[in-house]
């Protein structure tokens, strides 16, 4: 059967193991060939081919519900549920989503993109099944990296306590994006090296029965002995102690073993955990031997050489600029530390880690812990910097409010991927952080217009004593010359980038360049003043009051949600001053922005410079007509 002819996974039940093994090879070749053109999460999916085949063979989706943690490893699931023909549109505008999507298929029952949510969702599904009186199964597939997340551990505790019918498939590949860290990872390593617990139990019972005369009595009273043996085989028996029936570890690329174990698992009552050992990138050498996470998610590549196809770089990335600046500062300040929740690769932190390993802390997928860990350091006079993606910072909101800002602690947040990120879609767009930070007392929020200003703004932010967030976008800088010496710049004032008399556009970050383009497009018709409003909080009240007094129409521009955003702050300030300027706001509307190219998404919501220019022209002309 051609992969593009698949309608649903029911055909798998008619296939022999040898046929499934050949089919697994077809799927791997398909993924390698398709993603070479589109890019995507290659390594995670190559690692779960056999596991996904076995799951769909032994269970009955969509009656039995598969809940994929994070979701980037669901490509094989998508192929088996009739979407192979859409892979040429993967992660593209209006195309196939790179994560499970409920409106794509009845087989996608849970949408995700952030980690550690699957166990809680699966328990919710299992409870609902029980209340409705059906015997459908809830199966959560979670990686060993995601299992380190606090939410996953909370769910393990609850599922075990309630003895809920949840099947947990632990996909253990020793990596999340990069290699995993922490005590949970070390414990799983000890389990990997042990013998299989269930097999050991069976062998123990057989041996006891064979003991002459007393074998039968020992078998009846041998529970303590069996538990002692299990404890010796698997240190701590962590999952069994939490109330789970533990199976494994099993080779995640051995279909015979997988199918056998899944048959045991689906007959169990109560919570079950099947520990599956997989190889991330299995079947494609560059991905299989990737030790740092390059092949976790990437753009197009050359299949033969494994070379990632990149355009000519015109400037260092914003992430590199931040990491490089922090490394330079750490040479002069031995109190500066750097904390990341498992995003050291994406945020280019290797230069800092290489030079200052003792001051670099990768806490794993644990955003809440990362922020409060930083707060604890700050109470002792250290200068912690938390490097975190905008979308993942959402997970540490209470820690920001309660532990950092309330105590006015000296913690710097470098907010990576601020703004639209494109192909990863609605779960990853960095558009909410301004709105959820702006109303928190004590914290400052800043964003530079380019990579050169970014290094100085970050330098100033770290020097500042108190909580401060430095936002910066994904991708390369704009190619401006970089100053060799760092210096402080104001964290309270804005700059006029271009003079104008008809309208003033206030923008920050990359949107300053957009505002300058808008001014050029309107030149000769509308005289546009462009203001670099790099301090989002606090506002430059002196400049704003001068603008109110002048009576010039105001435009705010932000690649963030309008509700509660920068434009809202300007309106609030004007109201407080009893000033009533004409204000037009541009930003992200009140809906989730899906996946696609950034420019395609900006066009869809009307935020390209040409689109804004026409709106500004109308806004200014309307004001002129009203004043006549």
Swiss-Prot record:
<feature type="binding site">
    <location>
        <begin position="113"/>
        <end position="115"/>
    </location>
    <ligand>
        <name>thiamine diphosphate</name>
    </ligand>
</feature>
<dbReference type="InterPro" id="IPR033248">
    <property type="entry name" value="Transketolase_C"/>
</dbReference>
<keyword id="KW-0479">Metal-binding</keyword>
<dbReference type="InterPro" id="IPR049557">
    <property type="entry name" value="Transketolase_CS"/>
</dbReference>
<dbReference type="GO" id="GO:0016114">
    <property type="term" value="P:terpenoid biosynthetic process"/>
</dbReference>
<keyword id="KW-0808">Transferase</keyword>
<comment type="subunit">
    <text>Homodimer.</text>
</comment>
<protein>
    <recommendedName>
        <fullName>1-deoxy-D-xylulose-5-phosphate synthase</fullName>
        <ecNumber>2.2.1.7</ecNumber>
    </recommendedName>
</protein>
<dbReference type="GO" id="GO:0019288">
    <property type="term" value="P:isopentenyl diphosphate biosynthetic process, methylerythritol 4-phosphate pathway"/>
</dbReference>
<keyword id="KW-0414">Isoprene biosynthesis</keyword>
<dbReference type="Pfam" id="PF02780">
    <property type="entry name" value="Transketolase_C"/>
</dbReference>
<keyword id="KW-0460">Magnesium</keyword>
<feature type="binding site">
    <location>
        <position position="72"/>
    </location>
    <ligand>
        <name>thiamine diphosphate</name>
    </ligand>
</feature>
<dbReference type="InterPro" id="IPR005477">
    <property type="entry name" value="Dxylulose-5-P_synthase"/>
</dbReference>
<dbReference type="InterPro" id="IPR029061">
    <property type="entry name" value="THDP-binding"/>
</dbReference>
<feature type="binding site">
    <location>
        <position position="367"/>
    </location>
    <ligand>
        <name>thiamine diphosphate</name>
    </ligand>
</feature>
<dbReference type="GO" id="GO:0008661">
    <property type="term" value="F:1-deoxy-D-xylulose-5-phosphate synthase activity"/>
</dbReference>
<dbReference type="GO" id="GO:0009228">
    <property type="term" value="P:thiamine biosynthetic process"/>
</dbReference>
<comment type="similarity">
    <text>Belongs to the transketolase family. DXPS subfamily.</text>
</comment>
<feature type="binding site">
    <location>
        <position position="173"/>
    </location>
    <ligand>
        <name>Mg(2+)</name>
    </ligand>
</feature>
<dbReference type="Pfam" id="PF13292">
    <property type="entry name" value="DXP_synthase_N"/>
</dbReference>
<feature type="binding site">
    <location>
        <position position="144"/>
    </location>
    <ligand>
        <name>Mg(2+)</name>
    </ligand>
</feature>
<keyword id="KW-0786">Thiamine pyrophosphate</keyword>
<comment type="pathway">
    <text>Metabolic intermediate biosynthesis; 1-deoxy-D-xylulose 5-phosphate biosynthesis; 1-deoxy-D-xylulose 5-phosphate from D-glyceraldehyde 3-phosphate and pyruvate: step 1/1.</text>
</comment>
<dbReference type="InterPro" id="IPR009014">
    <property type="entry name" value="Transketo_C/PFOR_II"/>
</dbReference>
<dbReference type="GO" id="GO:0005829">
    <property type="term" value="C:cytosol"/>
</dbReference>
<comment type="function">
    <text>Catalyzes the acyloin condensation reaction between C atoms 2 and 3 of pyruvate and glyceraldehyde 3-phosphate to yield 1-deoxy-D-xylulose-5-phosphate (DXP).</text>
</comment>
<feature type="binding site">
    <location>
        <position position="284"/>
    </location>
    <ligand>
        <name>thiamine diphosphate</name>
    </ligand>
</feature>
<dbReference type="Pfam" id="PF02779">
    <property type="entry name" value="Transket_pyr"/>
</dbReference>
<feature type="binding site">
    <location>
        <position position="173"/>
    </location>
    <ligand>
        <name>thiamine diphosphate</name>
    </ligand>
</feature>
<feature type="binding site">
    <location>
        <begin position="145"/>
        <end position="146"/>
    </location>
    <ligand>
        <name>thiamine diphosphate</name>
    </ligand>
</feature>
<dbReference type="InterPro" id="IPR020826">
    <property type="entry name" value="Transketolase_BS"/>
</dbReference>
<dbReference type="GO" id="GO:0030976">
    <property type="term" value="F:thiamine pyrophosphate binding"/>
</dbReference>
<dbReference type="InterPro" id="IPR005475">
    <property type="entry name" value="Transketolase-like_Pyr-bd"/>
</dbReference>
<dbReference type="GO" id="GO:0052865">
    <property type="term" value="P:1-deoxy-D-xylulose 5-phosphate biosynthetic process"/>
</dbReference>
<dbReference type="GO" id="GO:0000287">
    <property type="term" value="F:magnesium ion binding"/>
</dbReference>
<keyword id="KW-0784">Thiamine biosynthesis</keyword>
């Amino acid at each position: 059967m051609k992969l593009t002819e698949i309608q649903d996974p029911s055909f798998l039940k008619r296939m022999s193991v040898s046929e499934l093994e050949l089919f697994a090879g077809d799927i791997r070749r398909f993924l390698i060939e398709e993603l070479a053109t589109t890019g995507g999460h290659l390594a995670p999916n190559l690692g779960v081919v056999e596991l996904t085949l076995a799951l769909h063979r032994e269970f009955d989706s969509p009656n039995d519900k598969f809940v994929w943690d994070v979701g980037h490893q669901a490509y094989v699931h998508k192929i088996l549920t009739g979407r192979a023909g859409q892979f040429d549109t993967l992660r593209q505008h209006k195309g196939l989503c790179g994560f499970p999507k409920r409106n794509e298929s009845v087989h996608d029952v849970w949408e995700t993109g952030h980690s550690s949510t699957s166990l809680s969702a699966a328990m919710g599904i299992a409870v609902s099944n029980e209340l409705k009186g059906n015997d459908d199964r809830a199966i959560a597939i979670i990686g060993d990296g995601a299992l380190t997340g606090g939410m996953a551990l909370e769910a393990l505790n609850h599922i075990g306590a309630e003895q809920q019918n949840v099947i947990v498939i632990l996909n253990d590949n020793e990596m999340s994006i990069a290699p995993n860290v922490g005590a949970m990872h070390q414990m799983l390593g000890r389990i990997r090296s042990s013998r299989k617990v269930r097999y050991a139990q069976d062998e123990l019972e057989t041996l006891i029965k064979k003991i002459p005369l007393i074998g039968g009595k020992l078998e009846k009273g041998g529970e303590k002995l069996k538990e002692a043996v299990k404890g010796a085989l698997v240190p701590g028996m962590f999952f069994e102690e939490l109330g789970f029936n533990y199976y494994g570890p099993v080779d995640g690329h051995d279909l015979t073993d997988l199918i056998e174990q899944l048959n045991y698992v689906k007959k169990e009552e109560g919570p079950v955990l099947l520990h599956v050992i997989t190889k991330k990138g299995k079947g494609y050498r560059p991905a299989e031997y990737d030790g740092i996470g390059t092949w976790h998610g990437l753009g197009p590549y050359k299949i033969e050489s494994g070379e990632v196809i990149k355009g000519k770089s015109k400037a260092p990335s914003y992430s590199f600029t931040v990491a490089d600046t922090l490394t330079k500062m750490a040479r002069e300040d031995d109190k500066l530390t750097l904390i990341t929740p498992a995003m050291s690769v994406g945020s280019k932190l290797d230069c800092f880690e290489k030079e200052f390993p003792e001051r670099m802390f990768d806490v794993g997928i644990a955003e809440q812990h990362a922020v409060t860990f930083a707060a604890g350091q700050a109470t002792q006079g250290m200068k912690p910097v938390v490097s975190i993606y905008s979308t993942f910072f959402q997970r540490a909101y209470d820690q920001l409010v309660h532990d950092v800002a309330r105590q006015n602690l000296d913690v710097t947040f470098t907010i990576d991927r601020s703004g639209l990120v494109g192909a990863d879609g609605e779960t990853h767009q960095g558009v909410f952080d301004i709105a959820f930070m702006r109303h928190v007392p004590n914290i400052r929020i800043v964003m530079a217009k380019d990579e050169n200003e970014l290094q100085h703004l970050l330098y100033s932010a770290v020097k500042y004593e108190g909580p401060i967030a430095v936002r910066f976008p994904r991708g390369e800088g704009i190619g401006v010359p970089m100053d060799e010496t760092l210096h402080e710049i104001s964290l309270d004032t804005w700059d006029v980038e271009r003079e104008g008399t008809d309208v003033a556009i206030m923008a920050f970050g990359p949107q300053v360049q957009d505002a300058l383009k808008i001014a050029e497009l309107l030149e000769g018709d509308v005289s546009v003043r462009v203001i670099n409003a790099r301090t989002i909080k606090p506002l430059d009240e002196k400049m704003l009051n001068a603008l109110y007094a002048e009576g010039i129409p105001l435009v705010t521009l932000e690649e963030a949600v309008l509700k509660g955003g920068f434009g809202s702050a300007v309106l609030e300030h004007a109201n407080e001053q009893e000033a009533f300027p004409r204000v037009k706001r541009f930003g992200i509307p009140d809906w989730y922005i899906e996946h696609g190219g950034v420019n395609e998404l900006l066009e869809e919501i009307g935020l390209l410079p040409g689109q804004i220019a026409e709106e500004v022209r109308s806004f200014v002309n309307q004001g002129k007509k009203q004043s006549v």
